[in-house]
């Protein structure tokens, strides 16, 4: 659930979206939930391509691309969530951020398995990117309105974000009512 959206630069990021933690059990995450997170992570890059065209895509999504690739690789190598099958293909120590351990794990597998892993990761990310672009195209009017408001205010709270979004898409009764109450308070 979105907590805040801002255009104000933070570190290397030119704008950010903060999410509230979900109510689901973080120890038990489904393939669908992980894939949805990858789709969301590719949203900014997808929006650039849909709105401005592929030649105008910027480096702004570099961190997002690293993150979604890392998550997709874990889907394949740690969670068995690919066409390769339900196998753990790397030792747990090689799943973390240690580059040397990852390189050693990769050197211990066959070239074909390494290529299969790379192909499975690419398939997941490519499919998620197509879904992200479809979401952007389908919700272009909402995105354009959010951009207009963000250009004016620079930052939107989660309820204000949902109030604008609910004018274009069904976000569920409970979220719609909360957003409407917040919008009424903001305009009163």
What are these regions (language model features)?
Residues 1-188:
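Soluble catalytic regions of large protease machineries
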């Amino acid at each position: 659930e979105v907590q805040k959206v801002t255009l104000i630069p933070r570190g290397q990021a030119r704008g950010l979206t903060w999410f509230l933690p979900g109510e689901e059990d973080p120890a038990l995450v489904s393939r669908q939930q992980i894939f949805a997170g990858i789709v969301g992570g590719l949203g900014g890059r997808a929006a650039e391509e849909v709105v401005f065209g592929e030649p105008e895509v910027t480096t702004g999504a570099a961190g997002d691309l690293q993150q979604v690739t890392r998550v997709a690789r874990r889907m394949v190598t740690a969670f068995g969530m690919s066409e390769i099958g339900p196998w753990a293909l790397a030792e747990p120590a090689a799943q973390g951020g240690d580059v040397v351990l990852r390189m050693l794990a990769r050197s211990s597998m066959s070239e074909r398995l390494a290529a299969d892993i790379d192909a499975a990761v690419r398939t997941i990310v490519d499919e998620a990117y197509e879904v992200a672009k479809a979401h952007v195209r389908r919700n272009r009017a909402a995105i354009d309105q959010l951009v207009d408001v963000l250009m004016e205010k620079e930052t939107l709270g989660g309820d204000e974000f949902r109030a604008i979004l609910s004018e274009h898409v069904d976000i569920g009764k409970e979220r719609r009512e909360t957003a409407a109450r917040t919008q009424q308070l903001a305009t009163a």
